Amino acid sequence: SFTGSPEVGRLVARECGQNLIPVKLELGGKGAAVIFDDVDIPEAADKLAQAITSHTGQVCCTATRWLVQKTIYDDFVNAAVDRLKAVQIGHPLGEGTQMGPVVSEVQHKRVLGYLEKGTAAGAETVLEGGAAQVEGCAGGHYVKPALLAGSLDNVAAREEIFGPVAYLASFNDESEGIRLANNTDYGLANSVWSSDLARCKRVASQFETGNGWINSHNVVVHGVPYAGVKKSGMGGGVVSLETLLDYYRNISVIRPL
């Protein structure tokens, strides 16, 4: 098995294919949160802020595209900005720290680079990110949470950044929300946010992903298959009974009666 980027996943699959070795790939993501106008706005903003800042956004299944129904777009954005501004950045073992550094200097430059590329390509800066300074941690690879908005064709909306950056866009109705959520090369995880459970089930069933959540995100339940489709992997189950089947093979033995 391999967990990592789609680019390296292709190389692993190619090498395994040359020797007919089965391989399971769990690759990147560009998850969407589809947020309807009957949602509890403060609660949704809080949970999605937690999702995007958990592990400093270095989670392949997190929601990095926030699709908000137009009728509540401004209210949701304001709530999300206020919530993200309150995130305490600091040493991972520090008291009160809610978000630590990214994993390396390379990743630090990658996150900042995508913010620059996104704005250069026309994205609106809703919440300015950038490097963060933490007292007593000079040289640490800290970044601030950031929100961009605009066309979903923007590079920051299409490519995996792997940092605390979300991209905002609005939609009019249910069908458009589903279409925008699925309009990506990735297929790891999406979520739907609404007080209407029937709508949530209907929308989630149309996600082109291996995983979906209702009024939550990044909640992993052991025993439930976890995997991606499209550019996010080759399906199958992780942390579930299906995982054990990777270590078994079937053999048919037939005898005359």
Regions found by a protein language model. Name each.
Residues S1:
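N-terminal Rossmann-like NAD(P) cofactor-binding module of classical short-chain dehydrogenase/reductase
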